[in-house]
A protein has these predicted regions:
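Core catalytic alpha/beta fold that binds nucleotide/phospho-ligands
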Residues: 1-208
Length: 208
């Protein structure tokens, strides 16, 4: 991973996308700072990873907003995308197993990470939700599992960027850019944002 010239907790910018990487097994959950809805959702999960992810998310956003974690004003769009009410930056998050990722920028954005695991039914999955060109790339690839996860994380990130589910049609008038992420070898990830005259830089931060 390249050297990072940007400090963690820098003021969000449209020139940067800050990516906070979290080992959920190394952090603690604090149910007291979660919303009622978050606590109810946490109770439905067998592991505490959801609660830890929301705890860390609120702690980071609170530090950027100069608010206590429980005071962070998180709202949910009709499509399910979280946003900060009345604030000038956006965030998106994803977690898989013990790994979490929180993306922050002044740009609208979507992020997805997945654990890399061989998928025997990858083509069947792809044909349900992916465009024909993505399916063709998977079929033609020597390492089709690798390409499947590239295409899947791109699909998720792009749809999350505009607050849509993966079965929803994307508006062709909305031009999106994306980048594959530099992550541990067992992970694949992607972040997407609306097309910009200047491509934003990615800054990686480890949460310890």
């Amino acid at each position: 991973m390249s050297d990072n010239p940007r400090q963690a907790f820098s003021t969000p910018s449209d020139q940067w996308i800050d990516l906070y990487q979290i080992d959920l097994d190394q952090q603690n959950a604090d149910l007291n700072i979660l919303s009622d809805d978050e606590r109810q959702r946490a109770e439905k999960h067998q592991s505490n990873h959801y609660a830890v992810m929301r705890t860390v998310m609120r702690s980071i956003l609170g530090q950027l907003l100069h608010l206590g974690p429980s005071e962070v004003p998180i709202w949910i769009e009709d499509g399910g995308k979280p946003y900060l009410a009345g604030r000038n930056f956006e965030f998106n998050l994803s977690h898989t197993g013990r790994y979490g990722l929180l993306a922050i920028s002044q740009l609208p954005l979507g992020v997805d990470i997945e654990r890399f695991r061989p998928q025997a039914n990858r083509l069947a999955i792809a044909k349900r939700v992916m465009p024909k060109d993505a399916i063709a790339r998977i079929e033609a690839a020597e390492d089709s599992d690798h390409v499947f996860y590239q295409e899947w994380t791109q699909l998720e990130a792009r749809h999350k960027c505009i607050g849509k589910g993966i079965f929803d049609q994307l508006d062709p008038a909305i031009e999106l850019q994306y980048a594959q992420l530099e992550l541990p070898s067992e992970l694949m990830g992607c972040v997407a944002w609306p097309r910009q005259p200047t491509v934003p830089k990615l800054a990686y931060h480890m949460v310890t």
